């Protein structure tokens, strides 16, 4: 399978415990995970933040006053996908622990999820759209060698 091209900027905010998140997100793996979810070439920035920055961004842009796992800011979908993906490290870490997943596996899923959002996929418009997006995410994760992220 031919994968699309990706120009990636990978950024880590400064926060306690950031090194564990750097270790879970080697650049080559992040590139691989995102490229598997792309249907077009892309320029994507991935930023790993603390709870304070994650909450501030979610409050400002989604009017929800809490830190969420991933925020997608899509700027263009054609001819090149241009987006920022912001992942909140404490939320991702907590969810991985609660779901009995390795940290890198949960990051892989959220990067796939965010990359699909950057290309116009939406799970909040209808149950049918949510099912379709989840099925596609599951297929991508299995291509990458991971288990179904939605399995109980």
Swiss-Prot record:
Cofactor binding summary note: Binds 1 zinc ion.
GO molecular function term, any single one: RNA endonuclease activity
One Pfam family this sequence matches: YbeY
EC numbers, comma separated: 3.1.-.-
GO cellular component annotations of the record: cytoplasm
Residues annotated for Zn(2+) binding in this entry: 113, 117, 123
PROSITE patterns given in the database record: UPF0054
GO BP terms in the entry: rRNA processing
UniProt main location, coarse: cytoplasm
Subcellular location: Cytoplasm
Reported cofactor(s): Zn(2+)
HAMAP family hit by this protein: Endoribonucl_YbeY
Chain's role: Single strand-specific metallo-endoribonuclease involved in late-stage 70S ribosome quality control and in maturation of the 3' terminus of the 16S rRNA.
Family: Belongs to the endoribonuclease YbeY family.
Protein name: Endoribonuclease YbeY
Organism of origin: Paracidovorax citrulli (strain AAC00-1)
């Amino acid at each position: 399978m031919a994968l699309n091209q990706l120009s990636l900027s990978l950024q880590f905010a400064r926060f306690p415990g950031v090194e564990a998140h750097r270790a879970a997100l080697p650049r080559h793996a992040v590139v691989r995970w995102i490229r598997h979810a792309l249907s077009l070439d892309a320029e994507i920035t991935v930023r790993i933040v603390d709870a304070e920055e994650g909450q501030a961004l979610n409050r400002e842009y989604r009017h929800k006053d809490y830190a969420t796992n991933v925020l997608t800011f899509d700027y263009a979908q054609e001819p090149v996908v241009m987006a920022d993906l912001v992942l909140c490290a404490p939320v991702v870490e907590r969810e991985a622990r609660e779901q009995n997943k390795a940290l890198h596996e949960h990051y892989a899923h959220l990067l796939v999820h965010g990359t699909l959002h950057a290309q116009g996929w939406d799970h909040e418009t209808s149950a049918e759209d949510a099912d379709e997006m989840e099925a596609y995410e599951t297929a991508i994760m299995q291509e990458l060698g991971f288990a179904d992220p939605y399995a109980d």
